[in-house]
């Protein structure tokens, strides 16, 4: 009896400890369960995706995929020379009126003597930049003895005696009332982004990814390299408009091509690395612009590598997913067999025959489907609102940083150095938290930094600059994550068109940021940043998680992919549990494990109360293989 009491006491204390331990670890078990369900959903989706099966046979990331990713990285690096070069081509110069008329009466005058005799001085003793003494028909001795008294604006142009570089400013004399309007230059660039995103996005879905990538590279070659030969500032703006079109066209089509060739987490890793190399390109551009003294030479150096790149572009292949949705199944088989040959793999014949079945129905879609398809409309509306807020925050932070008057080379270098690790950290975030939670985490960090900026004192400025850098660190990760998220949410048949449409929201956010920041110098723009962060968090919660699931090819969506979270709670867990867990429970190593019951609460109007019991598994998720039914 005493032993029974001791046993009951020990069992009771052990049960109490187990209950206490379970209560403490319940959140982590819920989080692990969520990760498990997400991975099982990806496994279930890949089991039904014939293209994913073919890619498994080819090799998920073999030599062909490496070559594809590298060939898309290189233009991303070079594109920075055309996108961000205006920061260094419009550096401020100190102009003085050209007074070479005095050399006719005093040809042996030095430059300092010439300026001293012909230019008026400011109260602080420096020469005035936009005024000169009126020329007089005197000899040199009379000018030195009596001096000149009457001034006028510069009549014979300007000189730049203290300029160390040759820029657009001193090339086209954009000084003394002829200064370029920065807002106009930004408007030209954003207009190019706007038209290019719509045009190239539409053409990419109609003609294919490969021809539009080739067209974008030709645009870099003609208008980027050709910028070095412009003869006026208006020609420069004209060329910059088409450079913006080529830039956004290449960004949309290259991401679509890479994501449609890769599967699983390789998609996210490739896009993040592409963005990281884009940032590395800015670092290279900054260092080169600091050393190269002539702006035309800088444009030539940035455009020359495009020539050999165009010659090697034939190595790329069209997206097989796009070929399949367009009904070009035989061409899709050819490019898949070519990829398998490069990877030294063999595709089973039965897998290729299965592609024939999916290719009999040609997916038909148009831009009107973004309005007529309810699910697609909700998704595009939500991600468009997030893109607007993200663009507004990004541009406002950049304008706030530029407002401190720091050296442009220092600012661009520090921004780029900060952005590279921020983007690389996103690989880990996406692996462990998924798209939605990783996006929410980075947006929360941006919100925190904006709140700090809102309440920080204006002095010392070093504290504000540090906070701005931390905010830009978080924003760099947000942009990469959400770009991947957006591309995965859109179907293959309208992926490029959808990316082009959400670019409208990005342009609208940029214009709003510039307009608000220009009108006020208070903390109002930062307050709007905080508000935009909250709105972005709200809208991002409306879109479904994509994780490592297979890309969608058509606009036909399942009910379980509804955008409403409450509907997902009803459908997704039950579907995944019924289809995937039945095979896992059958494993002999799992049948003896403890069961953890997780109950999903139904809505008030539900007819049945559903309870999902998920086995607690000691095996890693990667070792579980679902058997086909």
UniProtKB/Swiss-Prot annotation:
<feature type="transmembrane region" description="Helical">
    <location>
        <begin position="296"/>
        <end position="316"/>
    </location>
</feature>
<feature type="transmembrane region" description="Helical">
    <location>
        <begin position="524"/>
        <end position="544"/>
    </location>
</feature>
<keyword id="KW-0282">Flagellum</keyword>
<feature type="transmembrane region" description="Helical">
    <location>
        <begin position="410"/>
        <end position="430"/>
    </location>
</feature>
<feature type="topological domain" description="Extracellular">
    <location>
        <begin position="458"/>
        <end position="463"/>
    </location>
</feature>
<dbReference type="GO" id="GO:0005886">
    <property type="term" value="C:plasma membrane"/>
</dbReference>
<feature type="topological domain" description="Cytoplasmic">
    <location>
        <begin position="1"/>
        <end position="67"/>
    </location>
</feature>
<dbReference type="GO" id="GO:0097228">
    <property type="term" value="C:sperm principal piece"/>
</dbReference>
<feature type="transmembrane region" description="Helical">
    <location>
        <begin position="437"/>
        <end position="457"/>
    </location>
</feature>
<dbReference type="GO" id="GO:0048240">
    <property type="term" value="P:sperm capacitation"/>
</dbReference>
<feature type="glycosylation site" description="N-linked (GlcNAc...) asparagine">
    <location>
        <position position="149"/>
    </location>
</feature>
<feature type="topological domain" description="Extracellular">
    <location>
        <begin position="231"/>
        <end position="240"/>
    </location>
</feature>
<comment type="similarity">
    <text>Belongs to the major facilitator (TC 2.A.1) superfamily. Organic cation transporter (TC 2.A.1.19) family.</text>
</comment>
<dbReference type="InterPro" id="IPR020846">
    <property type="entry name" value="MFS_dom"/>
</dbReference>
<feature type="topological domain" description="Extracellular">
    <location>
        <begin position="400"/>
        <end position="409"/>
    </location>
</feature>
<keyword id="KW-1133">Transmembrane helix</keyword>
<dbReference type="Pfam" id="PF00083">
    <property type="entry name" value="Sugar_tr"/>
</dbReference>
<feature type="transmembrane region" description="Helical">
    <location>
        <begin position="379"/>
        <end position="399"/>
    </location>
</feature>
<feature type="glycosylation site" description="N-linked (GlcNAc...) asparagine">
    <location>
        <position position="98"/>
    </location>
</feature>
<feature type="compositionally biased region" description="Polar residues">
    <location>
        <begin position="7"/>
        <end position="16"/>
    </location>
</feature>
<keyword id="KW-1003">Cell membrane</keyword>
<feature type="topological domain" description="Cytoplasmic">
    <location>
        <begin position="431"/>
        <end position="436"/>
    </location>
</feature>
<feature type="topological domain" description="Cytoplasmic">
    <location>
        <begin position="485"/>
        <end position="496"/>
    </location>
</feature>
<feature type="topological domain" description="Cytoplasmic">
    <location>
        <begin position="205"/>
        <end position="209"/>
    </location>
</feature>
<feature type="topological domain" description="Cytoplasmic">
    <location>
        <begin position="545"/>
        <end position="629"/>
    </location>
</feature>
<feature type="transmembrane region" description="Helical">
    <location>
        <begin position="241"/>
        <end position="261"/>
    </location>
</feature>
<dbReference type="GO" id="GO:0005743">
    <property type="term" value="C:mitochondrial inner membrane"/>
</dbReference>
<feature type="transmembrane region" description="Helical">
    <location>
        <begin position="464"/>
        <end position="484"/>
    </location>
</feature>
<feature type="region of interest" description="Disordered">
    <location>
        <begin position="1"/>
        <end position="21"/>
    </location>
</feature>
<keyword id="KW-0496">Mitochondrion</keyword>
<dbReference type="InterPro" id="IPR005828">
    <property type="entry name" value="MFS_sugar_transport-like"/>
</dbReference>
<feature type="topological domain" description="Extracellular">
    <location>
        <begin position="518"/>
        <end position="523"/>
    </location>
</feature>
<feature type="transmembrane region" description="Helical">
    <location>
        <begin position="210"/>
        <end position="230"/>
    </location>
</feature>
<feature type="transmembrane region" description="Helical">
    <location>
        <begin position="270"/>
        <end position="290"/>
    </location>
</feature>
<feature type="topological domain" description="Extracellular">
    <location>
        <begin position="89"/>
        <end position="183"/>
    </location>
</feature>
<keyword id="KW-0325">Glycoprotein</keyword>
<feature type="transmembrane region" description="Helical">
    <location>
        <begin position="68"/>
        <end position="88"/>
    </location>
</feature>
<dbReference type="GO" id="GO:0030317">
    <property type="term" value="P:flagellated sperm motility"/>
</dbReference>
<keyword id="KW-0812">Transmembrane</keyword>
<feature type="topological domain" description="Cytoplasmic">
    <location>
        <begin position="262"/>
        <end position="269"/>
    </location>
</feature>
<keyword id="KW-0969">Cilium</keyword>
<dbReference type="InterPro" id="IPR036259">
    <property type="entry name" value="MFS_trans_sf"/>
</dbReference>
